[in-house]
Amino acid sequence: MMPKNSRENRAEQLAYLSKVRHQLISSNKVGELILKAKDESLDDKNKANLREMEREYIMSSSLPSDLVEKISSASAKCEGIWEEARKKSDFKTVLPFLEELVILTKQESLILSEKLKCSSYEALINKFEPQANERKIKTIFENLETFLSPLIDQIIDKQKNEEIISISNLMTQEQQKEVGLFLMQKIGFDFNRGRLDTSQHPFCGGAYQDIRITTRYNEIDPFSSLEGIMHETGHAMYELNLPSEWKYQPAGQSRGMAMHESQSLLIEMQITRSKAFKKFLSGILKNNFKFTENCWDTENIYKLEQE
């Protein structure tokens, strides 16, 4: 949605701001203040704030400012090129920019792993999920593999004989947006504090009390668009419902990607893929949006989602 010919300048601006922010957070003065604060008598709320401040300080002070600046610039450039390449499924165009970003990220991971005394992979995980480790993740996936592997075969076998009516090219992009906005409102999204726009991929971002959701529309598979909207609505509602009394404080920010994704997947997977929701959706499509064909019946759209 931003002008593409200004991309290079925006990348430079973001890189500079990232460098300034990094220098402020990683300064010796901040480290001294954190040490002094540890001697204070703090309530639980401010103990949590101090914990998060120290974590951010350790991560930031471990990295040189020029590397932080380079990563920010490379990330902004790569995202801009990817947005154009995504329209044409042109991976070759984005590849060199992605390679540069990967090289810089590996440098970051090596520095952080040495500081945190863990593997490079675990160091990067901790940027997005505090206190996560490879052992914990490995255990979770091993348990999932034991449960899911035989179940997937059973599901595929069951679906072989099911008759499903296609809905391809039966819902325009504008209709998808109208349905998506309607569902967002029903789920409880506050349009006085956020909005929905179009992009090359579903995203959720913004600032306190100002959340922006984007999605892309697919006339071949309209439910992929609707699920994308519902997924990002989950992210948005989590952000909009963080405790207002802790706004702008470290402990009042989202905890990590595991919690964030749990909220988006709760909406997308547990709610919108359930048969109860499909019954609700079928009624909405037929009564409110006049989609009267049999393909919009509850059983058919439920089966479509299970494929």
Language-model region placement:
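Short acidic (Asp/Glu) and glycine-rich catalytic loops that position anionic groups and cofactors
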Residues: 1, 54, 158-160, 209, ...
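A well-structured
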Residues: 1-130
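Active-site metal-coordination segments of metallo-dependent hydrolases
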Residues: 250-261
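A glycine-rich phosphate-binding loop feature that marks nucleotide/adenosyl-phosphate handling sites
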Residues: 5, 199-202, 254, 281-291
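Active-site recognition of the HExxH zinc-binding catalytic motif
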Residues: 113, 224-244, 261-268
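Long, amphipathic alpha-helical stalk/connector segments used for oligomerization, subunit docking
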Residues: 271-307
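Contiguous, non-catalytic segments that form substrate-binding/exosite surfaces or channel walls
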Residues: 71-223
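Secondary-structure transition/capping motifs at alpha-helix termini
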Residues: 186-192, 222, 236-247, 271-278
